[in-house]
Regions:
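Glycosyltransferase catalytic domains, chiefly GT-A lineage
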Residues: 71, 79-99, 144, 150-161, ...
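A short linear-motif detector with a strong N-terminal bias
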Residues: 2-4, 22-25, 124-125, 156-157
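C-terminal substrate-binding/active-site "lid" region of AdoMet-derived donor-dependent transferases
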Residues: 110-200
Length: 200
């Protein structure tokens, strides 16, 4: 019922979660549970590829929020990747490419009016580099992106620093807080396509 994060990173995540109003996450879990208890949040969008895990977590959230007068609206965005239960959302080896690409495209599938209200995004699922790169064209300049396991995997994810600035991190050296670089209009499509099938 807690996010799977390093201790100081967890504190940093809670700091931004407490200030948000509409929260979007790639990869559900303890972060979703904690967010569902936050009265400041109006809406949660959660992308998940493990249906059994999603259903188990949804039941925990329903039980945990019983009796609360104000809770966020939770919208599940389920993507079929042939994932085995408890395998961190890993796509099956026979999963079609279009389904893998669909995972990182979920924020773009929301209505413009919905996207514009999002002020906090957590990247903590699969296809992380592509998910972060695809967010760029849709989010407001003041939207915050929190990217877990970034600093210990910069060889996988470092490309995002061509388009985002790190505005905060902790000595745990994993989670980073990102905002869009102010002088960039869009990310070239060929850069995004290069990372769409990178499942890490």
């Amino acid at each position: 019922k807690q996010p799977h994060m390093a201790p100081k990173d967890k504190i940093l995540f809670y700091k931004y979660l407490d200030k948000a109003s509409v929260y979007f996450e790639y990869g559900s879990g303890g972060s979703t549970y904690v967010a569902s208890l936050k009265p400041n949040l109006k809406q949660i969008y959660s992308v998940e590829s493990d249906l059994k895990f999603l259903n188990t977590l949804n039941k925990l959230i329903e039980d945990g929020t019983k009796g609360m007068s104000v809770t966020p609206t939770l919208s599940w965005l389920y993507i079929e990747l042939g994932t085995k239960y408890g395998d961190w959302g890993q796509p099956h080896k026979n999963c079609p490419e279009h389904q893998k690409i669909s995972y990182s495209s979920q924020l773009g599938n929301l209505k413009k009016t919905e996207r514009e209200k999002i002020d906090l995004i957590l990247i903590d699922g699969r296809f992380r580099a592509a998910s972060c790169l695809k967010c760029f064209q849709y989010i407001k300049d003041d939207c915050v992106i929190m990217f877990d396991d970034f600093l210990n995997r910069t060889q996988c994810y470092g490309v995002v620093l061509d388009y985002y600035d790190i505005i905060e991190k902790t000595e745990d050296n994993r989670l980073v807080v990102l905002k869009k670089k102010p002088n960039i209009q869009k990310i070239p499509l060929e850069i995004i396509k290069k990372y769409e099938l990178e499942k890490s």
